[in-house]
Amino acid sequence: MLRLLSKRLYCKIATKSNEKATKLDFKQLTHPTKVPQTPVDAEFPDTSSSEIQIDTKTIQLLERLSLVDLDSERALATLKSSIQFANKIAHINTEHVRPLYTVLEQQQLQLRNDQVTEGDCRAEVLRNAKVTDEDYYVSPPGNIPLEQ
């Protein structure tokens, strides 16, 4: 097993115990450029009193598009609470807010050189798949449980 790991460059790097791992300096992350230090007040409309009504046609459409079974009461309650939350945050004023791409804006990302270390390992990769068809993975259909 160790011989197999030593062939791959990324495994060599992971198995070296004498190299120090790059750690995040959380003291530097106290105030990234676009994240405010203090919370911004926002007024949310009170939507807890209004009951969300979803017709069966909409539920069937959501089930088909998301491949999620919404037949249980728990799933419907989760969907309704998600809609209430979305209604709350839809009223937040974001007019003068710059887009945030990452919370770790001041942290440098360490990249390795993009070099091919091994090639043509298709057969080895396909051995990880439970079901294959003509050198392709076969994924399970939707939310149908797989046979054990």
UniProtKB/Swiss-Prot annotation:
Single Gene Ontology MF annotation: glutaminyl-tRNA synthase (glutamine-hydrolyzing) activity
The answer to whether keyword Plastid applies is no
**Quaternary form?**
Subunit of the heterotrimeric GatCAB amidotransferase (AdT) complex, composed of A, B and C subunits.
Tell me the GO BP annotations in alphabetical order.
glutaminyl-tRNAGln biosynthesis via transamidation; mitochondrial translation; regulation of translational fidelity
What further fact does the record state? This protein may be expected to contain an N-terminal transit peptide but none has been predicted.
Q: What does this protein do?
A: Allows the formation of correctly charged Gln-tRNA(Gln) through the transamidation of misacylated Glu-tRNA(Gln) in the mitochondria. The reaction takes place in the presence of glutamine and ATP through an activated gamma-phospho-Glu-tRNA(Gln).
Q: Which residues cross the membrane?
A: none
Subcellular location per UniProt equals: Mitochondrion
UniProt GO cellular component terms: glutamyl-tRNA(Gln) amidotransferase complex; mitochondrion
Q: Which terms are listed as keywords in the entry?
A: ATP-binding, Ligase, Mitochondrion, Nucleotide-binding, Protein biosynthesis
Catalysed reactions, as listed in the record: L-glutamyl-tRNA(Gln) + L-glutamine + ATP + H2O = L-glutaminyl-tRNA(Gln) + L-glutamate + ADP + phosphate + H(+)
**What EC designation does it have?**
6.3.5.-
The family line of this record is: Belongs to the GatC family.
Q: Which residues form a coiled coil?
A: none
Question: What is the name of this protein?
Answer: Glutamyl-tRNA(Gln) amidotransferase subunit C, mitochondrial
Organism listed in the record: Drosophila yakuba
Q: Which HAMAP family match?
A: GatC
Please give the Pfam families that the UniProt record associates with this protein: GatC (PF02686)
Q: Enzyme class, one word?
A: ligase
